[in-house]
Amino acid sequence: MMKVLVVVALLVTLISYSSSEGIDDLEADELLSLMANEQTRKECIPKHHECTSNKHGCCRGNFFKYKCQCTTVVTQDGEQTERCFCGTPPHHKAAELVVGFGKKFFG
């Protein structure tokens, strides 16, 4: 009976040690992932800034990610160029307005 208790205690110790190592590895992976997300967040393009060269790099707003909105600009020479900026599309503005009113009325 004593041998069984010793073996069970040994198994419990080994399992807890191996699971704690796994948890440490998982925490390290999560930390690296969070650091990568923070780096990506720092590299995103803020609202009203130019996104002509990186049309998918706009930052997130309060509720939605900003969209790269482009227009054609004609220079004084008559040359047409495309200029883009990060902004909130009209349907996202409407949704944010509705959510804002909902928060005011319902707390």
Swiss-Prot record:
Cysteines engaged in disulfide bonds, as pairs: C44-C59, C51-C68, C58-C86, C70-C84
Keywords of the record: Disulfide bond, Knottin, Secreted, Signal, Toxin
Principal subcellular localisation of the protein: secreted
Gene Ontology CC entries for this record: extracellular region
Tissue occurrence: Expressed by the venom gland.
Positions of the propeptide segment: 21-41
Range of residues in the leader sequence: 1-20
Cell compartments where the protein resides: Secreted
GO molecular function: toxin activity
Secreted keyword on record: yes
PROSITE patterns associated with the record: SPIDER_CSTX
InterPro entries assigned: Spider_toxin_CSTX_knottin (IPR019553), Spider_toxin_CSTX_Knottin_CS (IPR011142)
Family note: Belongs to the neurotoxin 19 (CSTX) family. 04 (U1-Lctx) subfamily.
Domain notes: The presence of a 'disulfide through disulfide knot' structurally defines this protein as a knottin.
Annotated protein name in UniProt: U1-lycotoxin-Ls1f
Species annotation: Lycosa singoriensis
Lineage: Eukaryota, Metazoa, Ecdysozoa, Arthropoda, Chelicerata
